[in-house]
């Protein structure tokens, strides 16, 4: 088949495979467009879970008649015009793909009017070349988008839609997330002609807790601790639930936003989990609604098709900033209980500090926490204290890093506590849920960790190997098999074929599926950790290993595979190390409590400190 340019409709349908996963994806893209247009009211009508109808109506700025046809074209946008705009993006959308992709897999109609126009205009695309037709219409200032019969022309995609109830639940969750991001916008959601959600706008300076309670429930509101934390151009606001009263139902509330964009970021989740670890059990998760504001130049949002992930240029700084912000609020909560009465609480006495000697954290002190009212009230919550001015954070992150390391090198002051033997294993407490905080990368593959003033070195390749083994070891259900686009066919000896047949059930539990004939074996599926490996080298080595075995246990095979996998990282970065440890702590909590040999090595600084003092 010769190389040729794809027809516009087919190209858009391919793009829709990334952008339009289900009806909720359509709702997300269209509502974000409404927010970018400055809408203060958005009405969303859904029929049959979004499969039959999705209608989004807003009172935004509207689209000019001359731009309606462009609005349905690929890579046409008003959000950016240059690379500089992309590197400092503040709008929710910017690629100009959503409307073109949605219109290629549905019957989409766009009706809009600007304040300068006397009449509205309607546009829709049809045909193989996606030609746009524009005609007059009746409509107030703003925009309405109707998406009919989603996936009507792609039956393979349509059959993967779930039940009406399931698809609407995904839409409901998307609207919850958006409503938490924009308190200043009224959002109404209806399903099959019935109003399901009404989120009224909160006026500037009003009580955001009212909408927070409507979305997250009064149980979260009663346990919520308000956060207000700032350092340089980083700001963290929001609420985190008291970990001492977190329930499984509350743990489902985990909403995080970066510059108003809803995110699912493992680095942020790890920082929050680490701050709460001392108060959470092994099977508990923190509950939070947090808003991170950062210089747009310091974050890359163009890393995921649906913009669910971001990449921070200074991931360590962001991680430590969030960790310290959440930790400080939890510590304040221990010192000052949440006031439930109407009497103002006296402000705590200011204690003089010596920052250089004490080696305090390099982030600015937070404003005083405003406790969240346990029930709805038209008056502001009582007991709050005026925010203290932010200390000047301009000397720079690099300069203040020295204070952190000085803190780690300091000999701890004696504590007035009952006599207890000094710990022989410095790194981790028995009930710890975290390896600690990553300070830096040493020799490209080791992470220097700090926990409770103790320093240790962690081998990242060994941690990665244990993580791969956990991912490969079957639990109650077999490991999920990932079909290969091109099956791998290998020639085997009679002995190797016999070993494979004996190990077939064990390999199936590991997600490895194969077929054999007289002299060949065809690998048809492998587990996810093997997808990025060189299977033409790994699989023959695995077959050779199996040929030497007499007993085929899935755990032993998983251990062998994990030891022989090639690492994806020749040079580890801070972000990669933090992500790896977050996964290890989640999937292999036993490694935190009892680290195996070769994984963790404590670093004793006392001889170095003594040598310095003896000079």
From Swiss-Prot:
Keywords: DNA damage, DNA repair. GO terms for cellular component: mismatch repair complex. InterPro entries: DNA_mismatch_repair_CS, DNA_mismatch_repair_MutL, DNA_mismatch_S5_2-like, HATPase_C_sf, MutL/Mlh/PMS, MutL/Mlh/Pms-like, MutL_C, MutL_C_dimsub. GO terms for biological process: mismatch repair. Residues 363-397 are annotated as: Disordered. Signal peptide: none annotated. One of its GO terms (molecular function) is ATP-dependent DNA damage sensor activity. The keyword DNA repair applies. Residues 364-387 have a biased composition (Low complexity). PANTHER family: DNA MISMATCH REPAIR PROTEIN MLH, PMS, MUTL, DNA MISMATCH REPAIR PROTEIN MLH1. This protein is involved in the repair of mismatches in DNA. It is required for dam-dependent methyl-directed DNA mismatch repair. May act as a 'molecular matchmaker', a protein that promotes the formation of a stable complex between two or more DNA-binding proteins in an ATP-dependent manner without itself being part of a final effector complex. Belongs to the DNA mismatch repair MutL/HexB family. This is DNA mismatch repair protein MutL. It comes from Shigella flexneri.
């Amino acid at each position: 088949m010769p190389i040729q340019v794809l027809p516009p409709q087919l190209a858009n349908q391919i793009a829709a495979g990334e952008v339009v996963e289900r009806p909720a994806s359509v709702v997300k893209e269209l509502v974000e467009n409404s927010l970018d247009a400055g809408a203060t009211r958005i009405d969303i009508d859904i029929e049959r879970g979004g499969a039959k109808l999705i209608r989004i109506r807003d009172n935004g700025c509207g689209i000019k008649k001359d731009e309606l046809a462009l609005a349905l074209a690929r890579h046409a946008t008003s959000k950016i015009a240059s690379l500089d705009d992309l590197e400092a993006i503040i709008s929710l959308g910017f690629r100009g793909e959503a409307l073109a992709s949605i219109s290629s897999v549905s019957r989409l109609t766009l009706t809009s009017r600007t304040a300068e126009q006397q009449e509205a205009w309607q546009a829709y695309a049809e045909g193989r070349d996606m030609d746009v037709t524009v005609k007059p219409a009746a409509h107030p200032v703003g925009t309405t988008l109707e998406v009919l019969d989603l996936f009507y022309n792609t039956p393979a995609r349509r059959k993967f839609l779930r039940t009406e109830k399931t698809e609407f639940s995904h839409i409901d969750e998307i609207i919850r997330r958006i409503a938490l991001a924009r308190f200043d916008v009224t959002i109404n959601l209806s399903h099959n002609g019935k109003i399901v959600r009404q989120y009224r706008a909160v006026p500037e300076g009003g009580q955001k807790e009212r909408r927070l309670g409507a979305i997250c429930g009064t149980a979260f509101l009663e346990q919520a601790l308000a956060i207000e934390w700032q350092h340089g151009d980083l700001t963290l606001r929001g609420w985190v639930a008291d970990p001492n009263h977190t329930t499984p139902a509350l743990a489902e509330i985990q909403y995080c936003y970066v510059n108003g964009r809803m995110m699912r970021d493992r680095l942020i989740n790890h920082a929050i989990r680490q701050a709460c670890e001392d108060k959470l059990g092994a099977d508990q998760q923190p509950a939070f609604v947090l808003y991170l504001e950062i210089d747009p130049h310091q974050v890359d949002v163009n890393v995921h098709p649906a913009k669910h992930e971001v990449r921070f240029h200074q991931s360590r700084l962001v991680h430590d900033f969030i960790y310290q912000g959440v930790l400080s609020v939890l510590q304040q909560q221990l010192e000052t209980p949440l006031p439930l009465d109407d009497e103002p609480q006296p402000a705590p006495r200011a204690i003089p500090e010596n920052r250089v000697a004490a080696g305090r954290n390099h982030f600015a002190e937070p404003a005083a926490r405003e406790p969240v009212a346990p029930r709805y009230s038209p008056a502001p919550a009582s007991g709050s204290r005026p925010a203290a001015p932010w200390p000047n954070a301009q000397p720079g992150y690099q300069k203040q890093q020295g204070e952190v390391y000085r803190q780690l090198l300091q000999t701890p002051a004696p504590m007035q506590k009952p006599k207890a033997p000094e710990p022989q294993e410095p790194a981790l407490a028995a009930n710890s849920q975290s390896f600690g905080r990553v300070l830096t990368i040493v020799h490209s593959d080791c992470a220097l960790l700090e926990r409770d003033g103790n320093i240790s070195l962690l081998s990242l390749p060994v941690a990665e190997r244990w993580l791969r083994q956990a991912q490969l070891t079957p639990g109650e259900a077999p490991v999920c098999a990932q079909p290969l686009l091109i099956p791998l066919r290998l020639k085997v000896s009679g002995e190797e074929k016999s070993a494979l047949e004996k190990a077939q059930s064990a390999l199936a539990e590991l997600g490895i599926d194969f077929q054999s004939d007289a002299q060949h074996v065809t690998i048809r599926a492998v587990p996810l950790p093997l997808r990025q490996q060189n299977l033409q080298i790994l699989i023959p080595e695995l077959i050779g290993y199996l040929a030497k075995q007499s007993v085929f246990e899935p755990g032993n095979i998983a251990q062998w595979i994990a030891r022989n996998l090639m690492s994806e990282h020749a040079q580890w970065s801070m972000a990669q190390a933090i992500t790896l440890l977050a996964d290890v702590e989640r999937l292999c909590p036993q490694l935190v409590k009892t680290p195996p040999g070769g994984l963790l090595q404590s670093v004793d600084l006392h001889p170095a400190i003594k040598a310095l003092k003896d000079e």
